[in-house]
């Protein structure tokens, strides 16, 4: 069902700003009842987080449904108000079906080129988002910069007089 059930926590330091990064398993819809107890610690990690980095495999045919499942799960566990940074990974593996110019049938998500999909998501997302490829190392510096800015903002709000870090 999953590659791992355990949450991994690592200390990360960006430009002298330390923070803890937890990697949890992905959420699935209709989790079998007998597995819910196994995921309690993961759900606790999510509830206690200051920022959620939601990594989405954009090459998966149902990535939008997966996003909806995660949003609903966050609502269900009382973490729907957490700030989320939406990371669309695997842009190098994204494919679409090109429509002929004379095709009059309505376009669907499967007909959107990556640039059009980006515009669509950026326009409708109520959260910051980025499109990258971890494998091809595309847009990783922007991801790092964005994440640093978000963590710095949280840190500055929590420790307003501790500005020696940034």
Which stretches of residues belong to each language-model region?
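Switch I (effector-binding) loop of TRAFAC-class P-loop GTPase G-domains
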Residues: 1-19, 28-38, 59, 63-64, ...
């Amino acid at each position: 069902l999953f590659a791992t059930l355990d949450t991994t926590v690592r200390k990360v330091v960006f430009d002298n700003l330390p923070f803890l990064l937890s990697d949890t398993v992905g959420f699935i819809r209709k989790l079998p009842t007998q597995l819910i107890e196994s995921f309690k610690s993961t759900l606790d990690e999510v509830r206690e987080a200051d920022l959620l980095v939601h990594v989405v495999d954009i090459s998966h045919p149902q990535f939008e449904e997966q996003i909806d499942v995660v949003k609903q799960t966050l609502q269900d566990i009382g973490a729907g108000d957490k700030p989320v940074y939406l990371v669309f990974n695997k842009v190098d593996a994204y494919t679409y079906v090109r429509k002929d110019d004379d095709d009059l049938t309505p376009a669907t998500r499967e007909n959107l080129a990556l640039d059009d999909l980006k515009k669509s998501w950026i326009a409708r997302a109520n959260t910051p988002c980025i499109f990258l490829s971890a494998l091809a190392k595309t847009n990783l510096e922007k991801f790092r910069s964005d994440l640093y800015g978000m963590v710095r903002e949280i840190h500055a709000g929590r420790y307003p007089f501790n500005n020696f870090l940034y």
